[in-house]
Amino acid sequence: MSRRENKSSVVKKDLSVKKESGAEKKSLAQSLRDWVSSLMLGKPHAVMAAVSVAVLLAAFLIFNNLTVSYARRWDIDWGYYSILSTFVLLIAGIIVNIPFVAKHLKGFLPSGKSFCGLALLLIFFSVFMFGNISNTHRVLSDETSWESMGLQMYFQHTGGICNEGVWTDGVLDCKTEVNNFKGKALGFVYSLVFNFMEPDRDTALLVNYPFYILSLIAFFLALSKWFGSSKLALAATAFLGGMPIYLLQARSASTEVLYICLLTFLMAWYAFVPTNKVTWKHFLLTVPLLGFFAQTRQETVFAFVPFALYYYRYFLEKPYRLPAFIASVIAVSWPSVNNMAAYRGYDFQGGEHAAHSFDNLWFNLKTNIVTMLNFDTDPSFGGIMTNPFYTTFTIILLVATVWLLVRMIVFGRYVRGFILGIFFCLQIFVIMFNVSGTFTIDINQRYVLVALPMFALLMALGLYDALEFSTKMRKYAAASIVMGLACVLTLGLMLYHAPSYRNNMLYYKNKLLGEEEFLNNELASYPANSVFIYSRPWQMLAQGHSAFSERTFEGWSTDVFAEWMQKSGGNIYLVRGQDGYGKVNRESRVVGFKTTDQIDKILDSYKHERVLVDAKKFGYPLVIYKIISKKGVSHYAQNFTVSEQMDGMIVLNKRFPESIACDYSLNDEKQGDILLTLEADTLRLDSLKIRNGMNRALFTCSMPDADTTIIYRDFFLESDRAVLLSALKMERYAQDWGDPQVNQSVEHHRLTLDGEPFRYGIGSHANSSLEYTLPRGFDMFHAVVGLDDESACGDGAYFVVLGDGRELARSKKLYSMEKQKLDVEITGVRHLNLKVEMGDNKDCDHGDWAHSWLEAR
């Protein structure tokens, strides 16, 4: 074959852009009318549309009727298992489609020469990234929350974030789990990776680079097929891979990199399966991919329309196909939908701006374009870029988009792509409706990542089409020129701005990143059993440190404080960072919080020693205090602990040489006196005095300084005749404020009534209704009820017990510092409903059902 013939065959094989003639010159309106006529819609399609709408309406009604409390509980209890089932379905989809892929793969792949070009591009990107971009967090609170979620999925198989916890021998014991309005996909990926590598932040930071490389390969394969030109696909891939924001995030732990990876996988899969060869087997892979895609960012569910439109002819063939597809996608995407219900009406900013509005849309649109066109540099950092956007790329994008719109409107070109693209952009509109969708908030400039693949596609296609149309040059030559221009621009700009990458452009202004890196190195030298009090405890957990929030630490009783002093060997540290100074700016669009008041209160309430201060590095003093003791409380009481009961024994520990005398009682019966002379002593309880159900040991100890310390130790002996209410599943609940808490108050503190702590029970809030289905055979319900001591301003509340809809007991009106014991007969009752009813108002009515349990006589 001659060289000319070979080149001609390459042109025919490599390009699929039609000549400008005939149908191409139809008006846009005429093209749409012809398309609708070609569908030959009839009664079956009307049925299909009706059923599809019904499925969507049913899903919306379920979503709209989910209570916030129920949605949040479901998120924690079932979030992990939901995405795990989607992962299993994904594996099944891959296995089922292996024969189809093996049969058609060779015809799908572009030429070996084009793969060599892609390989060179990937090598350049990789060398540049590892040489110029540090591997670190860039959006600290979000990235560490996914890491903490991954830890919780790995250790506990639940769907929330471990907000507070303790590391013991490499295992995280989560003390407080909270919801996360972010998606679960990245956390789940971490939970898988933690099976093979250390479960910590350093492992998490290694995950995104492979996603980055895989996304560029998938993007190239998809566009090679759709463009019919591997050169044009390589141009778009160069634009995508060289975007500064993408390069930076690929060396972080951001979910947007996984988002792009999954999107490009979907693009490649859709390009691989022609519309005339699609079967149900292909959707067995498509649906779980969409499920994972939806759980990268919750707004992604608004981008699903084009994934159905692409195969519209397949769906039109059978009336059940589209409704089945919609129902399946809703099922695998439900965790994201549930998150929207869980945070419905949640005011993230707490300021003067509406969470979602058209004002936000216009403000964000204007400010984002201005930011992406920003030429400003920072002379104090050697003239580096202040924003991770190339102005050149933004100009190309704007011009290319306008050109393609003109081509569509005037010449009727790219209509199908426009329709698919505009539906895909629904998620972008949702983001920009949000108050924090503006790039004036530096860390939110990463939101542009959801649109980067589309931007790269438009840039390459717009340049190619404008060049080919205006010069009438051969399409192969036009594609080659665009490829060369894209590669030269991308690689040249990367090299020119290498100092900006090395100085972590944009993110160098985020003081919290420097604070995190400093603490990660500094705290590594502290004792392994140290406990840190910090505004972002989940971040500490991801670094492998035990941590609690300032608010939780404030709520520690002397007994609890002594317990943690014992466990930590006296190594409790308060870390005061950026969050510990100033007040929240209510006029700002930035999501923020401050713990200044809590820290000041802790420093006033505890004796402490300042062990580290750095006042220069961050623009504010970063201080670490070692907590010594509580002020105004016996030093001996803070160094005396009593263990929980285990096998009929309780261990008493003291961290001082003097002897102390204690008397103790068991279930309100005095048992005797103890003289403690050793550092630790073991007390064996009288087994005859221990009863089925609830037990309480009470220790009253005289300290060397004449102070008296009282410590309660509750334990429950479960049997077929005694069961804790908190061990039963709560079938449903409604609560006017907060969520019911198991063995904690509604604000996550120890249940405390009239100064008396309780180990077991349910913390609630008026007005509330907690419903249980009871096992058969139980005759009595026991509880101690009242308003928790954490709520001192309530005007009283009633505690009501209902059985099978009938009122069985009602407490008197209980005020703060009051409690009442309830012993209610429930023989034959199947449905138990516990209500807390407010007095004149519900403010501060934190109602506790302490020591609630069932007994069979």
Regions found by a protein language model. Name each.
Residues 115-123, 288, 326-330, 457, ...:
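Signature aromatic-anchored transmembrane alpha helix within multi-pass, membrane-resident enzymes
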Residues 89, 631-661, 667-671, 677-682, ...:
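Gly-Asp-aromatic-enriched flexible segments
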Residues 483-540, 553, 623, 652:
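Membrane-embedded, lumen/periplasm-facing catalytic core of multi-pass transferases
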Residues 310-400:
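Membrane-lumen/periplasm interface segments of specific transmembrane helices
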Residues 111-114, 225-226, 231, 276-281, ...:
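Membrane-interface helix-loop-helix junctions at transmembrane boundaries of multi-pass membrane enzymes
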Residues 78-86, 147, 250, 256, ...:
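Hydrophobic/aromatic-rich transmembrane helices and adjacent perimembrane loops
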Residues 141, 206-211, 235-265, 270, ...:
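Multi-pass, polyprenyl lipid-linked donor-dependent membrane glycosyltransferases
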Residues 50-60, 119-122, 234-235, 240, ...:
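Transmembrane alpha-helix segments characteristic
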